[in-house]
Regions:
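C-terminal catalytic/motor cores of large multi-domain enzyme assemblies
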Residues: 1-223
Length: 223
């Protein structure tokens, strides 16, 4: 597996003109909504993660900005009709480590509950190396989240043939300024790595601003 990972990453870095754009997200409302929903859904065995909101937000952002949901195909840009988000899953170091990308299909048409359930099921299959080729194929965008490890900021290498990957840090509870007042709130830094053949800087900024609007007003993710 390590040889396959190495080959794909080297191919990505040497053939794709990478660049990165970062943005901070205020997650006070998202964390409060997540706590409320998890309290209401606890009896059903459902627990939404921050990443579930992020995946849903990414899908809705791509529906508005379809150029992020595209690939470079030789000499032209291929626009994808489906929004299939790959979720990077780290494998146990005790079992040799590695990384697999589990693919959630048609994410823009799925609820937070459905995304959460499917992500958990696919992640468990990934950790036991039980994913089928179909469950690892046809992603059009990838999310990599190291927030659960306390990482604040990082950049990720694009997962071909995708044109973008979002690297999410931790939602940190810290002193912040809200309405010109110093208070305690949640902030997350996310960095988007992009293929410059497909997505220009201003296009990336517009996509990130749409995502920011969704995550900072998380009720929009429930519609």
């Amino acid at each position: 597996m390590r040889q396959i990972i190495a080959k794909r990453l080297v191919e990505s870095k040497t053939t794709i003109p990478h660049y990165q754009v970062s943005m901070k997200f205020e997650l006070d409302r998202l964390m409060a909504l997540r706590e409320q929903l998890n309290s209401e859904l606890a009896g059903m065995g459902i627990k939404l993660s921050v990443n579930d909101f992020i995946v849903r937000g990414c899908a809705l952002s791509m529906a508005k900005h379809p150029y992020v949901n595209a690939s470079w195909a030789g000499e032209k840009i291929l626009m994808h009709q489906q929004v299939n988000v790959g979720v990077a899953v780290a494998l146990d170091e005790e079992k040799g480590g590695g990384l697999l990308v589990a693919v959630i299909r048609d994410v823009d048409r799925k609820s937070l509950r459905a995304i959460s359930s499917e992500t958990k099921a696919l992640s468990e299959k990934a950790r036991t190396r039980g994913l089928s080729m179909e469950e690892m194929s046809d992603s059009t965008f990838t999310v990599s989240n190291l927030g659960m490890f306390g990482v604040e900021h990082f950049t990720a290498i694009i997962n071909p043939p995708n044109s973008a990957i979002l690297a999410c840090g931790a939602a940190l509870k810290q002193p912040v300024v809200r309405d010109d007042q110093l208070t305690i709130g949640y902030e997350m830094t996310a960095t988007l790595s992009l293929d410059h053949r497909v997505i220009d800087g201003a296009m990336a900024a517009r996509w990130l601003n749409t995502l920011k609007g969704l995550l900072e007003n998380p009720a929009t993710l429930l519609v």
